[in-house]
Amino acid sequence: MVQGTMSGAGKSLLCAALCRIFAQDGWRVAPFKSQNMALNSFVTRDGLEMGRAQVVQAQAAGVEPDVRMNPILLKPSSDIGSQVIVNGEVRGQMPAAEYFRRKKQLIPDILAAYNSLADDFDIIVIEGAGSPAEINLKADDIVNMGLAKLVDAPVLLVGDIDRGGVFAQLFGTVELLEPDERARIKGLIINKFRGDVGILRPGLAMLEEKTHLPVFGVVPYLKADIEDEDSLSDRLQVKNAVKPLDAAIVRLPHISNFTDFMPLEQHPLLGVRYVQTTRELGAPDCVILPGTKNTVDDLLWLRQCGLEAAISKLARRGTPVLGVCGGYQMLGQTLADPEGTESGRPQTLRGLGLLPTQTTFAAEKRRTQSQATVTAAPFAGAHLTGYEIHTGRTTVQGAPFCTLADGTPEGCVQGQVFGTYLHGLFDSGELTEQFAAYLCRRKGIDPAAAAPISMQEYRTQQLDLLADGVRHNLDLAAVYAAMGLAQPAERGNDQ
């Protein structure tokens, strides 16, 4: 089990690396996180919802994502409450205080999922959440040491040196644990190091002396480009290098599934920016409204900050606008919430009015994987595979964006404004290339200047890069010994 000294210490990516390494070494591996809080989610083949971090880890392990890998998913819908999803199904909205009172009732679900995975796989790589030393939360812990005790898991504790104070992080965390919890920690890991590791060696020796725990490795700041489901992801902060095409994605307050746009970020001609103000928006070559966990609140925010008027003005001038899921709903004429499902109280709002659609929210959530062929003129014929996660039902009076495999029309297009419910639409190389070519033609750029990108190949390369970086800087023999396993001789450890 990998636990961290804080959120953002690198647990998710370290778990992905270990999944990849163990799979490369010939083991059947599965990831597991008992409780995940995230806005980015995924729909499995059987229509169940789980966090994307475990999806990435499953891909690293070479196995299909399975809801057992993340039995509890919390999707924040406000500053004080979340939608609670158990075994892929929505249990309802809960204020944080209520969830904390009731979460121990979910232990049977957690153990059933874990034990079922343990029957099917050789190694389970468990990810903790936040820090195990949050002393105000320890009594009801089901995701850090509380879980480690339930499943009798050895623990690796990782600290983030890039933020500074890593020795205090690790020592303080260990000191705040109970003796039986400290005994579960088999080794310490320093993550995200930049520079000469020799400078750290005196500190490492002192840390080992004070904690009575070995340091298993110092992992460098790896530049592997792996999906990050954290809503505070650096991906939303960094402005891409200047490229011929400028795509502005609105960073909504409750933005979700922004991993949809990772393929665009990798395109050699597309510069992707995440914007929050009219000044940042400027005059891009296209505007994208992403998914959101709270369409109503984010539509009101869009209106209040002036972005609604700015986007509408750009659309009237012919700038392409794309809405995905909640962003698609916002582009329509009206959004009705008769039961208060989305906003907490019955109301009807006007949308941006850029598409001839009306959306009504209902309690039942649609979750499905879909294959489709795009029918919208600029991208007609492009094949894509995606997934839907939404409560709104949208009535369309215009032309569809695409046709699903069963012949059902999906989404809407009017002029240069496009809307679809399909997450993951740009994972299809066909649509990504046609989208870029469309923008190139509008700007007089030769689209042939860019070589096609296979996101599947790119993700594989990045996962291998991540695994290689960890393999070369972690004492894998010690990691295997902590699990009571012998390190496979054929690969060994290159440290």
What annotation goes with each model-predicted range?
Residues 1-315, 320, 337-340, 363-364, ...:
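Flexible phosphate-sensing "switch/lid" loops adjacent to ATP/NTP-binding sites
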Residues 341-368:
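Conserved P-loop NTPase catalytic core
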